[in-house]
């Protein structure tokens, strides 16, 4: 595989390569201007409590699956939590000022771990891959990659792709956006290993809900076409330097609202 640049778009051996990931795709679909700020301009953003809490929980669950099956219980996760929190503080000193009430922070993290054990029994199965990076060239100009929380392969060969969410589950009928992310991972796995995943699974620790979906070759072919179309749209936007802002309720949560042309006319 050819050498990669560290930026979202860059020149590699004389060819411009667009780096696509589920998060950057989501940015572009929600608001092309947001995509520009993050992927093209690479403007810095302060860390958010929600994102940092998600990282912490993911790291605890990753460590949990390193333990023997008999030790994968709530007590072990509870013991891992403060260790992972101290490591996070050492790696990111901004967390010290971001988290103003450490007890409340850890209590909320503990509640999410408790919810995890109410919807899954990690001592009953083996996880094959955790925090695995998958990548693939969609075209000569579009490179797709993503980090998958967990992939489980059953002794009989069935593949399950799992993603942890520390927020609450979407309302009925609004699951598609989250499932699209998992279809991207399923497509990457299929292209890399030649095996069609059997099950996509979203674990919402905020309200102890599980969303499951099967997957077919027809769906993955459709996902492939959709990704290529989105990639072409982004490449056109880059070529034309046209990233129109898209106003929505999400604007109130956007760090770049103060400089966005949609709110400064």
Model-derived segments and spans:
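Metal-dependent nuclease catalytic regions and adjoining charged, substrate-binding loops involved
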Residues: 5, 19, 75, 156, ...
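Nuclease catalytic cores
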Residues: 25-26, 30-69, 106, 110-114, ...
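Short beta-strand or tight-loop elements
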Residues: 21, 126-132, 144-148, 247
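Short acidic (Asp/Glu) and glycine-rich catalytic loops that position anionic groups and cofactors
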Residues: 34-41, 58-59, 88-90, 162-166, ...
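Charged, compositionally biased N-terminal leader segments and the immediate start
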Residues: 2-23
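Short, polar/flexible loop-turn hinges at active-site or ligand-entry regions and domain interfaces
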Residues: 42-50, 67-72, 98, 171-172, ...
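A non-catalytic, helix-rich entry segment at domain boundaries
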Residues: 60-130, 137
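Mg2+/Mn2+-dependent nuclease catalytic core
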Residues: 132-225
């Amino acid at each position: 595989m050819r050498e990669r640049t560290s930026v979202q778009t860059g020149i590699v051996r004389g060819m411009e390569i667009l780096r696509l990931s589920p998060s950057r795709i989501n940015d572009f679909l929600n608001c092309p201007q947001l995509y520009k700020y993050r992927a093209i301009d690479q403007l810095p953003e302060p860390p958010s409590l929600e994102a940092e809490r998600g990282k912490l929980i993911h790291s605890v669950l990753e460590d949990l699956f390193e333990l023997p099956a008999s030790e994968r219980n709530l007590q072990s996760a509870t013991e891992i939590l403060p260790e992972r929190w101290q490591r996070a503080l050492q790696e990111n000193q901004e967390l010290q000022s971001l988290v103003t009430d450490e007890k409340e922070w850890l209590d909320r993290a503990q509640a999410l771990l408790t919810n995890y054990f109410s919807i899954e029994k990690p001592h009953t199965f083996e996880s094959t891959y955790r925090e695995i990076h998958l990548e693939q060239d969609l075209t000569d100009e579009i490179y797709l990659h993503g980090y998958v929380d967990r992939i489980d392969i059953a002794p009989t060969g069935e593949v399950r792709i799992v993603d942890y969410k520390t927020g609450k589950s979407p309302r009925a009928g609004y699951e598609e956006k989250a499932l699209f992310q998992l279809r991207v991972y399923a497509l990457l796995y299929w292209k890399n290993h030649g095996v069609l995943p059997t099950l996509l699974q979203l674990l919402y620790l905020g309200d102890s809900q599980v969303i499951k979906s099967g997957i077919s070759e027809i769906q993955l072919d459709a996902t492939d076409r959709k990704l290529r179309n989105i990639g072409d749209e982004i490449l056109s936007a880059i070529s034309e330097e046209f990233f129109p802002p898209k106003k929505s309720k999400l604007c109130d949560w956007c760090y770049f609202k103060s400089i966005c042309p949609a709110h400064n006319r």
